[in-house]
Amino acid sequence: MKIVQTAGRAALGEFAPEFAHFNDDVLFGENWNNQDIDLKTRSIITVVSLMSMGITDSSLKFHLQNAKTHGVTQKEIVAVITHVAFYAGWPKAWAVFNLAKEVWNVNEGDLPYEDEAMRAHAKEMVFPIGASNEAMQQA
């Protein structure tokens, strides 16, 4: 999946065109499309970096949503934020958790696949994935 970003030009294209270029073409166009790190890992690294700096504004929320888009589950982001809290600070974790709760629902993405239709189907099956199956155990 190729990352394409136009927010820099949209927000700052006339006012700061060089910065917009660096944002859209270099940061996102080149760095985010580098194949040496997968997008899920890159997203986690970005969230951790912003959290460590105490940046808990709309840019962090964007990157939390981006992490979700690239396969980070609710349980994974909770584990990441909790781990980083011990190194970057407890108040920062609280701030990030408040944003993360706006992006993920509890247990969202905890199945081994991320497709919405498949998740919905898995929860409605005769024997839903992840649910106990007492009827089968008694047979």
Model-predicted segments: where are they?
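Short amphipathic alpha-helical surface patches that mediate protein-protein
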Residues: 65, 82-85, 98-101
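Short polybasic/polar patches that bind polyanions
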Residues: 33, 51, 68, 86
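Substrate/cofactor-recognition hotspot
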Residues: 43, 83-91
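Acidic, glycine/proline-rich low-complexity segments that act as flexible tails and inter-domain linkers
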Residues: 1-41, 60-61, 69, 93-139
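Short alpha-helix boundary/capping elements
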Residues: 49-56, 88-89
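Short, structured motif recognition centered on aromatic/hydrophobic residues
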Residues: 41-51, 60, 64, 77-81
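Helix N-cap / loop-to-helix initiation motif
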Residues: 38, 56, 71-78
